[in-house]
Design a protein with these regions (language model features):
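Phosphate-backbone binding interfaces of nucleic-acid-interacting proteins
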Residues: 1-208
Length: 208
């Protein structure tokens, strides 16, 4: 669940994005201060909008915001009060982590993409399709996992590139908006001593 808030641009609306809706036709069901956004074809909820959000709790900052469990509980109380059966889940796992490329094979339908198996934790490996020219087996880099919001506002969801499933993105310094990031293509390269699954820390993982 990706939570965003920008009172100046959007108004006092807390926006909670659950899934990528793609090109699907969307519909809205509103009850009180809660609006459910769902796909018409599957009746699947893809987002919630909470109006007059500051009446539930104080919200600091703008752009992506991170809710406490207590705040999510308060929103769930409102969903229940308005008659919605679904409940919000507060996913507090880090979405930008150290990843290590364990395997890499050429994409069968591309001359520049590779299909990578990337360790993102002690017991977790994900498949990521990438076109970085410096990608190689053994490289440690920063991975944006599904549920991440990039500095430019784009959201990371499970997807596919030319028919091959991809569950995240290996990031370049420029995509992470790091200071003095080189303009050339290529994902960030970390020290071999870094451990897969470690949360991304710009102060530690980036040296200008």
């Amino acid at each position: 669940m990706i939570v965003t808030y920008n009172k100046e641009q959007v108004g006092d609306v807390l926006m909670l994005t659950l899934k990528n809706s793609g090109d699907a036709k969307l519909a809205v069901e509103r009850k009180g201060k809660v609006a459910r956004v769902f796909r018409e074809d599957k009746q699947e909820t893809v987002a919630w909008n909470i109006f007059d959000a500051s009446s539930f709790f104080a919200i600091e900052g703008k752009g992506q915001v991170f809710l406490t469990d207590e705040q999510v509980d308060r929103l769930n109380q409102e969903l229940e009060r308005e008659g919605f059966a679904e409940r919000l889940v507060n996913d507090r796992e880090p979405k930008f982590v150290v990843g290590e490329i364990l395997e890499m094979v050429a994409h069968p339908d591309s001359d520049h993409l590779n299909i990578c198996q990337v360790a993102v934790g002690p017991d977790k490996t994900v498949q990521i399709v990438a076109g970085a020219p410096n990608a190689r087996v053994g490289l440690k880099t920063i991975v944006a996992l599904p549920g991440a919001m990039m500095p430019d506002g784009s959201l990371i969801f499970p997807g596919a590139l030319r028919g091959e499933k991809s569950y995240g993105m290996m990031c370049s310094p420029r995509e992470l908006h790091l200071p003095n990031a080189p303009q050339k293509r290529g994902i960030i390269e970390l020290d071999d001593a870094e451990v897969a699954g470690t949360p991304f820390d710009p102060a530690r993982h980036w040296h200008e």
